[in-house]
């Protein structure tokens, strides 16, 4: 079997809600179709941007079923990580029948594991998984950073750990990862505004929030970077940069949902404990969207 190799733009899909906070499956299906038509390289349902902690088991399986049904052979990287081994394995068992190609597994949050604890946890997950795994390092949300040496150790010791989504915001750490990563191991940006730098250094792509809004443009930037066309990539980066920053004006996915609402693709509703975008964020995202489409 060929090893899965992730590269380019993977969209971390938002989960649309109706005005009464039910999952809007129709809007979700339309959003998935828009992603496919826009040329993204892979999709990432059930991750942070999808508000997965607020979803029921039935909602998770239905969202994954819809995604698989609509994307054909496009790779699906499904979020399944928790802060316990048993919880993560239970999510894998729940979701695997619905067709993911690989798992996105976050560094356990709240527990604050040491580097050795992180290594043992991911090795245990890898040994029990029938699908490839991408590590998700996002210390701003988890309270624990996976150092480059730990990620490389896992990449070398666990053949089915195939990549890492790196959202530490530390360029030195990302550079070390890229420099030492074994062949076929994908280093993916977890921050849209770091994608240009990460891919120019040798990384393979991005798991993007902004591509919910501008999938064709973010994909084109990644395509340019994969071809070492820095001139085109820089132009796209600068055009998209206000969107990259605006998507984090409040906790993700609050601003990106405001942007999607501006485009008429879904409501801006989020589930508690998140709250809808403030008036100032709505105004900001409206301006960003209007300016972005004016410059198209």
Walk through the language-model features, giving the residues of each.
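Short, well-ordered beta-to-alpha junction loops that form the rim of enzyme active sites
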Residues: 138, 167, 259
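Catalytic alpha/beta core domains of metabolic enzymes, predominantly
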Residues: 127-128, 141-248
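Gly/Ser/Thr-rich helix-start
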Residues: 9, 48-51, 80-82, 164, ...
């Amino acid at each position: 079997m060929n090893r899965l190799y992730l590269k380019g733009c993977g969209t971390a899909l938002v989960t649309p809600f109706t005005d009464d906070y039910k999952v809007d499956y129709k809007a979700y299906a339309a959003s998935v179709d828009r992603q496919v038509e826009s040329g993204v390289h892979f999709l990432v349902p059930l991750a942070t941007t999808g508000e997965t902690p607020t979803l029921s088991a039935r909602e998770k399986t239905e969202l994954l079923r819809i995604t698989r049904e609509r994307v054909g052979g496009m790779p699906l990287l499904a979020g399944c990580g928790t802060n316990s081994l048993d919880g993560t394995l239970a999510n894998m068992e729940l979701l695997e029948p619905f067709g993911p190609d690989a798992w996105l597994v976050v560094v356990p949050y709240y527990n604050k594991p040491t580097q050795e604890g992180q290594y043992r946890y991911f090795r245990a997950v890898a040994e029990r998984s029938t699908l490839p795994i991408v590590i998700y390092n996002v210390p701003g949300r988890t309270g624990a950073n996976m150092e480059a040496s730990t990620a490389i150790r896992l990449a070398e010791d666990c053949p089915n750990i195939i990549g890492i989504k790196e959202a530490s915001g530390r360029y030195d750490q990302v550079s070390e990862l890229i420099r030492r990563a074994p062949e076929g191991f994908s280093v993916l940006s977890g921050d849209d505004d770091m994608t240009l730098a990460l891919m120019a250094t040798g990384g393979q792509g991005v798991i993007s929030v902004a591509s919910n809004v501008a999938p064709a443009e973010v994909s084109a930037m990644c395509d340019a970077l994969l071809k070492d066309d820095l001139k085109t990539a820089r132009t796209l980066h600068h055009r998209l940069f206000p969107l990259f920053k605006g998507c984090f004006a409040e906790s993700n996915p609050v601003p990106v949902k405001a942007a999607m609402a501006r485009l008429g693709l879904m409501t801006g509703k989020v589930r508690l404990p998140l709250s809808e975008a403030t008036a100032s964020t709505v105004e900001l995202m409206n301006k960003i969207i209007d300016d972005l489409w004016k410059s198209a």
